A protein has these predicted regions:
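Extracellular glycan-associated modules
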Residues: 1-200
Length: 200
């Protein structure tokens, strides 16, 4: 504390030299604040969280495509979502949308990826569009026996012509495709069914 008092006594803040010191301190402070704001905005763009809380899955939520950072490498992407399913009674016998990127509707062309709860079983169907011989083909993978009445995570990881699906961080499915995997550039449509969903 005595050092600060000594420094204050040595510098006359009303003099030209004192005003320069004040200007430098203010400039450094402003630069630090601007730097923090820029880094925070870059972090938020690179690591988006679309929903900070769970959303009821019987409510349809749309994440606009402009908020989604697409992969710079064709056929490389990862989607991870946390899901809670109470039971299979709601809309029994019908595919239930967890999320779809692109066209809405089970097995519609150019949805990649699409994730659905199977009509009558506790399994998740993952649909990806691939391109082979100038033709779009929908490929399907089935993740059987997901947990009921507790939260679980599902991650879909596409790498060139193969896809890996992880349930609670453990590899469950790995599948190569003959065509190139297409990542749709449309909106992400989440839910519209029942239960709760939380995704990043």
């Amino acid at each position: 504390m005595n050092r600060l008092v000594n420094i204050r006594n040595q510098i006359n803040f009303k003099s030209k030299k004192g005003k320069i010191y004040i200007a430098i301190i203010v400039a450094v402070f402003v630069i630090l604040v601007i730097n923090y704001i820029i880094k925070k905005r870059r972090w938020d763009r690179a690591n988006p969280i679309f929903f900070s809380n769970s959303i009821p899955a019987d409510t349809r939520a749309i994440v606009p495509s402009r908020k989604i950072k697409n992969s710079i490498n064709k056929g490389h992407f990862t989607y991870m979502i946390w899901i809670y399913v109470e039971d299979l009674k709601y809309r029994y016998g019908v595919h239930k949308n967890i999320f779809t990127k692109g066209n809405i509707g089970y097995y519609s062309e150019s949805q990649s990826p699409g994730m659905y709860i199977s009509p009558k079983r506790n399994s998740i169907e993952i649909v990806l569009s691939t391109m082979a011989n100038n033709q779009i083909i929908n490929e399907k993978m089935i993740l059987d026996d997901f947990p009921m009445k507790k939260w679980f995570s599902v991650a879909v990881v596409a790498h060139e012509k193969s896809v890996a699906v992880f349930l609670n961080g453990e590899l469950s499915i790995s599948k190569p495709f003959s065509g190139d995997i297409i990542e749709n550039t449309g909106n992400i449509v989440i839910g519209g069914n029942g239960g709760f969903i939380k995704g990043e």
